[in-house]
Amino acid sequence: AHSRRNEKASLKNIFDLCEFFVNLHVISKPMPVKKKKSVDLSTQPIGVFDSGIGGLTVANAIQKVLPHESLVYFGDTAHLPYGDKSPDSIKYYSIRIAQFLMQKNCKMIVIACNTASSIAFETVKDFVGGKIPVVDVISPVVEIVTHNKNIHKVGVIGTKGTIKSDIYAKKIKAASKKEVASLATPLLAPMIEEGFFNNKISRSVIASYL
């Protein structure tokens, strides 16, 4: 009975996390399986990954909303930035990371990377095979934009991979009649990774793009 209560409490935390991401859709649904011994989800961590340290902002937000949850963060600094990598490479890296997080017994995977979310989300979902939920960072932005009646024009900046995928424009236009303008900003990710943000250099780079 205690294990069942812990499982229910942990599942509530997962739903709270999804609500925090603004009605984020949990794409992966558990596949029908034979009944097994119940697992205490409260002891399993939430896996978060990004191409570098940028996803730590997502991990930090999760910890604020779910302070009792443990996290496993994977920053793939060996291959950053993902934005200039081929789709096949990004899918390969994402699968390897998902495999690592599953080996760490994570009960959920959060793809805290726009490039990986736009290119490898379906690949990761297929690899996981419905064993655990997989969520991305694109869906909540689309939800906010499409449901806000005061937003009529949307500007999207991102890595070359994210912009080339056109994922934001496709999803926003599919759910609304809003105008979308996209711009690749390949210098932003490495600049942030190197610690150049909120200073003269970062402001100059941003100004040159805008």
Describe the residue ranges of each PLM region.
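Non-catalytic structural scaffold of enzyme domains
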Residues: 32-210
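Short, low-complexity, charge-dense intrinsically disordered segments
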Residues: 1-9, 14-28
